[in-house]
């Protein structure tokens, strides 16, 4: 799961609410500027941020396939919120060719199911802004037939 440092606690809460166990920061995207010749620095809340973490969380006892997968990813910025494609390749190298899905995706990727309001998938309905509520910590009240159920993936 991609996260940002100012929202890290929310990411960890969501992992727990979905029934996963947080293990580590799997990847650290070191953002290069679009030309790839320097580094991007955001405005930051405390310090001028550059990196974005991708967290690893598990259910069950999955086995690591490769011990040679590095954590650092040096890659240029893309369009807003689009993540480096090479992280998908690193995930497959790390865990093997298992069924996988990218939630909140912006594009299709070979070998991956994708879901998100900008992904080339069936229409995604708007949802309450509080992801933890969606995950079952609190059930929002909605009138019957107001919203189609979420697609089963």
Feature roles, as predicted:
Residues 1-153:
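Class I S-adenosyl-L-methionine
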């Amino acid at each position: 799961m991609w996260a940002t440092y100012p929202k890290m606690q929310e990411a960890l809460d969501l992992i727990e609410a979905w029934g996963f166990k947080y293990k580590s920061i799997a990847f650290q995207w070191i953002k290069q500027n679009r030309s790839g010749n320097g580094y991007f620095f955001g405005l930051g809340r405390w310090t001028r941020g550059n990196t974005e973490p991708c967290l690893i969380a598990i259910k069950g006892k999955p086995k690591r396939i490769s011990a040679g997968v590095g954590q650092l990813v040096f890659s240029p910025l893309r369009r807003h919120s689009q993540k480096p494609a090479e992280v998908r390749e690193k995930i497959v190298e790390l865990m093997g060719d298992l069924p996988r899905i990218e939630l909140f995706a912006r594009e299709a990727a070979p070998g991956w199911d994708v879901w998100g309001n900008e992904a080339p998938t069936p229409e995604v309905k708007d949802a309450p802004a509080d992801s933890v509520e969606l995950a079952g910590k609190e059930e929002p009240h909605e009138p019957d037939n107001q919203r189609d159920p979420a697609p089963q993936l």
